[in-house]
């Protein structure tokens, strides 16, 4: 789903963009060697204690979230521009873990915000721009999961709040 809205005014131009992705199905069939292994497991030749993963109904499991949202709100007037960008990724179950009461371990959703400010100008007859940005404005950390880095790197990033300053000149 995409929603786009633009308005021009005396105090500047405003732009709002929202994109939402919603999955209701995410399935993968076993093929090749996995198909043969699944047949052996179905026949009882491979014990139930040995899981075969990566196919079947994968929605909401192991990094496959069922929704993702992006929102960008920007304003510009003359040489000035400010933009706020948000990204939210939905929650999912980590199937290799469970809670003591038998409930599945849910890796919660994660939302990050980025703020960018820029100014365009001329420098010695060349177009130039200076930009300052704060990525992960609220210092959101990736949700804890039982993975190599303590979070699900296939679905999340754990960079923490960071800043950059960019200077561009067109020669």
Predicted regions and their residues:
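C-terminal beta-signal and adjacent terminal beta-strands/loops
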Residues: 24-27, 85-97, 119-171
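Extracellular loop and loop/strand-boundary signature of outer-membrane beta-barrel proteins
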Residues: 54-59, 99-105, 150-155
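Short, well-ordered amphipathic alpha-helices
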Residues: 1-6, 114-120, 167
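Outer membrane beta-barrel transmembrane domains
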Residues: 101-120, 128-131
């Amino acid at each position: 789903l995409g929603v786009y809205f633009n308005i021009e005014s005396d105090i500047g131009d405003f732009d709002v963009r929202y994109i939402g992705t919603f999955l209701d199905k995410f399935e993968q069939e076993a093929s090749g060697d996995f198909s043969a292994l699944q047949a052996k497991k179905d026949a009882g030749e491979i014990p139930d204690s040995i899981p075969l993963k990566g196919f079947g109904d994968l929605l909401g499991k192991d990094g496959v979230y069922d929704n993702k949202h992006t929102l960008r709100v920007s304003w510009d007037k003359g040489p000035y521009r400010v933009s706020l960008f948000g990204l939210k990724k939905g929650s999912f179950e980590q199937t290799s873990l469970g809670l003591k009461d038998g409930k599945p371990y849910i890796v919660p959703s994660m939302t990050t915000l980025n703020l960018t400010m820029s100014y365009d100008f001329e420098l010695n007859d060349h177009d130039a721009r200076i930009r300052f940005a704060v990525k992960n404005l609220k210092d959101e950390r990736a949700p804890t999961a039982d993975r190599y880095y303590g979070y699900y790197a296939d679905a999340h990033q754990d960079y923490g709040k960071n800043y950059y300053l960019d200077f561009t000149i067109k020669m």
